[in-house]
């Protein structure tokens, strides 16, 4: 009986780790950044991290407008990457799919931010979201040069 309980606990621990967001830098190091699918995912992750920040800090706070504009920029880039990947796909269908993915990621990131705030006193303590946002900002800045 003890072996069965230990096995069940082990399975649940694997499942809980399987659904966590991989740090974006780690993801990019493991994948080909020239692949439109990878670029679309990167764009959706960057959009989601910025949207999560807008939800967390609120409209009246400093930084909201920057985060919201970054979200919109990354959303549009994700759409462009989708066009490269699936040129024949209906734009409305593509937009809905991209938006759905971004919202799913945003919901997870918002939970991570809240959990970090509750357990550590800082929204960025114990997670990779600030590192992801910084990476996204560096990418946008390097493209703009």
Predicted segments with their positions:
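N-terminal signal peptide c-region/cleavage motif recognized by signal peptidases
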Residues: 13-16
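Residue-level signal for mature regions of secreted extracellular proteins and peptides
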Residues: 9-11, 39, 129
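Sec-dependent signal peptide recognition
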Residues: 2-7
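Cleaved targeting-peptide boundary
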Residues: 18-27
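Short N-proximal segments of mature Sec-exported proteins
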Residues: 32-88
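Interfacial loop at the N-terminal end of multi-pass membrane proteins
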Residues: 27-28, 116
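Compact alpha-helical subdomains of small soluble proteins
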Residues: 75-145
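Domain-scale activation on soluble regions of proteins
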Residues: 30-31, 144
């Amino acid at each position: 009986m003890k072996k069965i309980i230990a096995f069940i606990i082990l399975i649940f621990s694997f499942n809980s780790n399987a659904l966590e967001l991989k740090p974006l830098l780690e993801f990019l190091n493991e994948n080909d950044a020239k692949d439109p699918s990878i670029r679309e995912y990167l764009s959706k992750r960057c959009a989601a991290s910025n949207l999560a920040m807008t939800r967390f800090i609120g409209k009246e706070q400093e930084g909201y407008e920057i985060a919201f504009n970054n979200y919109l920029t990354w959303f549009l880039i994700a759409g462009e990457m989708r066009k490269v990947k699936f040129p024949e796909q209906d734009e409305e269908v593509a937009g809905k799919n991209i938006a759905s993915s971004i919202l799913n990621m945003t919901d997870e990131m918002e939970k991570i931010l809240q959990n970090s705030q509750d357990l550590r006193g800082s929204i960025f303590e114990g997670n990779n979201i600030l590192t992801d946002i910084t990476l996204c900002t560096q990418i946008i800045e390097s493209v703009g040069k």
